[in-house]
Amino acid sequence: MATILQNLPAGQKVGIAFSGGLDTSAALRWMKNKGALPYAYTANLGQPDEPDYDAIPRKAMEYGAEKARLIDCRTQLAHEGIAALQAGAFHVRTAGATYFNTTPLGRAVTGTMLVAAMKEDDVHIWGDGSTFKGNDIERFYRYGLLTNPSLKIYKPWLDQLFIDELGGRAEMSAFMTKEGFGYKMSAEKAYSTDSNMLGATHEAKDLEFLNSGMRIVNPIMGVAFWKDDVVVKAEEVSVRFEEGQPVALNGVEFNDPVELFLEANRIGGRHGLGMCDQIENRIIEAKSRGIYEAPGLALLHIAYERLVSGIHNEDTIEQYRMNGLKLGRLLYQGRWFDPQAIMLRETAQRWVARAVTGTVTLELRRGNDYSILNTESPNLTYAPERLSMEKVEDAPFSPADRIGQLTMRNLDIVDTRDKLGVYAQAGLLSLGGNAALAQLGDDSSRK
């Protein structure tokens, strides 16, 4: 039996990741009519745009599900978000603005926890709403098979019969009305939105065109800080970490990471913090564009990186950043639980995060405009007296020590100048006359 089923397996249990929206509602009812036994599974990821989670399973049962379950994924999502923060697992950046991989983190949690719940119900066929052009189809495929090696994949959107009968939203709405549910198709937005507790992604439709920007987006986790009529007042905020774990905001301690993220989202969201516009490479190497929100993660990230820079040495920070870039790509590709990803994140959590204890105080203003006001930690290696421009007692080194250190540099300076001479003889550089700086030569004619 093939792993990916191209036709509906009639008479068999088919699990569907059910959001309650038009697409999955129509798919569930259609599968029921065609003789399958649909089981609906809904992930509670703390989506900021979902008003009533409990209503979703009830809706699935009305549409013909054999069973409908709501799976609370928020705590696991919070833990994975903190792990990504500790490891700096963010590789999509533009001019200092960071995408915090919030959708890939949500898929890692959803893809494992929903399939585990299906397995409990003896459901070994899974469908979801991801399209063949996106990243999610591969992420869910990997996480599903990692969780249940016997899993088979059925996606209505890859079934030609489903496409022929219900190929668009208008057809789906008409189908649900005909079935007696009177489903009213929601008004079309100029873009699509996917969200969880960690962040929101806005993409597609008008946002596929680069002459449409952030200003057409209605934020769901914060304020439209670019609008002149939106009042944003400066706010002083403190964030405290203990051994790499965020534990307090504005002096209030949180034992529940979910509640901490929700409060961080409220604080950052008041300013529009963490909203950015990115062009990125999808898994299949084609470029896509997204507008992202992540107010809470952005707030925690600023404080965490400030402490990292004050506590760890340059080589450790360099390794942390290099590993974070690689780990971010693995997370984006749906490989968060692969051995190489586990190795990279464990390294950061053990040897970087465990030393990160302290409090950072910031002033948040508008959008990503902020200032760091204070950094406190018992583990700081930053010590102002070491490099003070004033005379200090017990100085760590003297002028004579620096003379000796500079004298030792003569060795590599001589070697470097000799090497530049070699390049000049080869025609790669010009050291003409008493030139103080080497200049690149024209080697276009050399083979």
Curated annotation (Swiss-Prot):
Protein name (record): Argininosuccinate synthase
Q: Which reaction does it catalyse?
A: L-citrulline + L-aspartate + ATP = 2-(N(omega)-L-arginino)succinate + AMP + diphosphate + H(+)
Phylogenetic classification of the source organism: Bacteria, Pseudomonadati, Pseudomonadota, Betaproteobacteria, Burkholderiales
**GO term, biological process aspect, one:** urea cycle
The Swiss-Prot or TrEMBL record annotates one GO molecular function as: ATP binding
Q: Which UniProt keywords apply?
A: Amino-acid biosynthesis, Arginine biosynthesis, ATP-binding, Cytoplasm, Ligase, Nucleotide-binding
EC number(s) of the enzyme?
Answer: 6.3.4.5
Positions bound to ATP: 17-25, 43, 129, 131, 136, 194
